[in-house]
């Protein structure tokens, strides 16, 4: 029986993870749950799952949860703050950690799981975007196992030979006959909207994704295609690709989740309904297969499958991310920080939709100008850079 810590338990990925665990209750025990500040949802999860441990990033929320659990005679030990999340990520009795905390906040807890040599189900793409080689080196150093949860990276993973699956971050695609990886994306809700109308997009419009059910931040990132840009950076690290080996393709139907092209002309594609329970189940039981609760794909009802080149004038954030990927670690760390700040401001109705790109570009340019030669050889140096980039973004936001 696998014993799990679920980081980001109250979010979309966390909920899907627990759904898969419930489908296969004889195979999984939920030992610990971690979240940010959603006390009510966390209380409900603790009532249902009776975990030994829980952790809340917000100390006040942790205290409220502790009181609520105690008054209901639930014996779950509650930890607080980033330290609490790191603690439940490295518990001796846990062998598998679902890393699903959104954004930079997930970096340290995820790295704690890596340093404890756990099986990491990586849904937090920002951890790799922010730390890159440092993360990959830590996985090897501490004997952790890395399995990608993002639907696209999981699709690529499934289309690659086991010898690559077992050596993520250090694989040689060329030696295994792989010519290129095709990273697919739906293009979001505005792929056919007139570009001149994007300035009027509201948060409500941006979070209404046509295919996937996701949280607000990732939904906005999908609308700008920054999400695909971050996934591009993650794929570069996971699969050790060159620029020539990694391509982005718009696929509006979200049926093919990504593809791998081989030198002999073969293309392997992973297909399925757009439901995160599929890649989650794949990683939770790897290398076995278990039920995810997702309906099988009915090919008679799919209709057409279409593919388009990405238009960078429509998706400038995608171009920013791809450029940052080849500019160095300072660029990807800085861009991720800027994007988190600008998307939060957009969701709070403080800036417009097209301002997101403008803020991201300003911060990226400033970070590249000031920190190009900065030695980023520790988590502390990355976190310092992340903080400085957020300060740059906050300054830029005040001028909008």
From Swiss-Prot:
Gene: dxr
Domain of life: Bacteria
Cofactors that this protein relies on: Mg(2+); Mn(2+)
Similarity section: Belongs to the DXR family.
Residues reported to bind NADPH: 10-13, 36, 38, 124, 126, 215
Pfam family, one: DXP_reductoisom
Keyword check for Hydrolase: no
Pathway: Isoprenoid biosynthesis; isopentenyl diphosphate biosynthesis via DXP pathway; isopentenyl diphosphate from 1-deoxy-D-xylulose 5-phosphate: step 1/6
Annotated NCBIfam families: Dxr (TIGR00243), PRK05447.1-1 (NF003938), PRK12464.1 (NF009114)
Name of the protein described by the UniProt record: 1-deoxy-D-xylulose 5-phosphate reductoisomerase
Gene Ontology biological-process annotations: isopentenyl diphosphate biosynthetic process, methylerythritol 4-phosphate pathway involved in terpenoid biosynthetic process
Assigned keywords, A-Z: Isoprene biosynthesis, Manganese, Metal-binding, NADP, Oxidoreductase
Claim: Ion transport is one of the keywords in the record: no
SUPFAM superfamilies found in the cross-reference section: 1-deoxy-D-xylulose-5-phosphate reductoisomerase, C-terminal domain, Glyceraldehyde-3-phosphate dehydrogenase-like, C-terminal domain, NAD(P)-binding Rossmann-fold domains
Function comment: Catalyzes the NADPH-dependent rearrangement and reduction of 1-deoxy-D-xylulose-5-phosphate (DXP) to 2-C-methyl-D-erythritol 4-phosphate (MEP).
Gene3D superfamilies the record matches: 1.10.1740.10, NAD(P)-binding Rossmann-like Domain (3.40.50.720)
Binding site for 1-deoxy-D-xylulose 5-phosphate: 125, 151-152, 186, 209, 222, 227-228, 231
Chain sites annotated for binding Mn(2+): 150, 152, 231
Catalytic activity: 2-C-methyl-D-erythritol 4-phosphate + NADP(+) = 1-deoxy-D-xylulose 5-phosphate + NADPH + H(+)
Broad class of enzyme this protein falls into: oxidoreductase
EC number assigned by the record: 1.1.1.267
InterPro entries, sorted: DXP_reductoisomerase, DXP_reductoisomerase_C, DXP_reductoisomerase_N, DXPR_C, DXPR_C_sf, NAD(P)-bd_dom_sf
Disulfides per UniProt: none
GO molecular function, one term: NADPH binding
């Amino acid at each position: 029986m696998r014993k799990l810590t679920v980081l980001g338990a109250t979010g979309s990925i966390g909920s899907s993870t627990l759904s898969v665990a419930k489908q296969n209750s004889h195979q999984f025990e939920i030992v610990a749950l971690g979240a940010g500040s959603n006390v009510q949802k966390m209380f409900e999860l603790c009532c249902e799952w009776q975990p030994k441990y829980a952790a809340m990033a917000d100390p006040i929320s942790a205290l409220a949860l502790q009181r609520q659990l105690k008054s209901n005679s639930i014996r779950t030990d509650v930890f607080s703050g980033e330290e609490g999340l790191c603690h439940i990520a490295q518990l001796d009795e846990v062998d598998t950690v679902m890393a699903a905390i959104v954004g930079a906040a997930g970096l340290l807890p995820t790295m704690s799981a890596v340093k404890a040599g756990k099986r990491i189900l990586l849904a937090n793409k920002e951890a790799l975007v922010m730390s890159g080689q440092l993360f990959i080196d830590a996985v090897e150093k501490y004997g952790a196992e890395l399995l990608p949860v993002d639907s696209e990276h999981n699709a690529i993973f499934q289309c690659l030979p086991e010898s690559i699956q077992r050596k993520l971050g250090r694989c040689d695609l060329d030696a295994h006959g792989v010519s290129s990886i095709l990273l697919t994306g739906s293009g979001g809700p505005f792929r056919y909207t007139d570009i001149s109308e994007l300035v009027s997009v509201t948060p409500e419009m941006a979070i209404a994704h046509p295919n996937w059910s996701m949280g607000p931040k990732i939904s906005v990132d999908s609308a700008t295609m920054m999400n695909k840009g971050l996934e591009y950076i993650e794929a570069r690290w996971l699969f050790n690709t060159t620029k020539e080996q990694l391509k982005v393709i718009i696929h509006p139907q979200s049926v093919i989740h990504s593809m791998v092209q081989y030198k002999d002309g073969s293309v392997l594609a992973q297909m399925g309904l757009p439901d995160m329970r599929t890649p989650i189940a794949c990683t939770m039981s790897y290398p076995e297969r278990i039920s995810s609760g997702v309906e099988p794909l009915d090919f008679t009802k799919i209709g057409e499958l279409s593919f388009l080149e990405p238009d960078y004038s429509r998706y400038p954030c995608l171009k920013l991310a791809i450029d940052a990927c080849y500019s160095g670690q300072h660029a990807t760390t800085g861009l991720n920080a800027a994007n988190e700040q600008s998307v939060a401001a957009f969701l709070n109705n403080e800036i417009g939709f097209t301002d997101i790109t403008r803020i991201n570009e300003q911060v990226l340019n400033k970070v590249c100008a000031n920190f190009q030669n900065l030695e980023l050889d520790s988590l502390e140096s990355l976190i310092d850079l992340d903080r400085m980039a957020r300060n740059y973004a906050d300054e830029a936001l005040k001028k909008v």
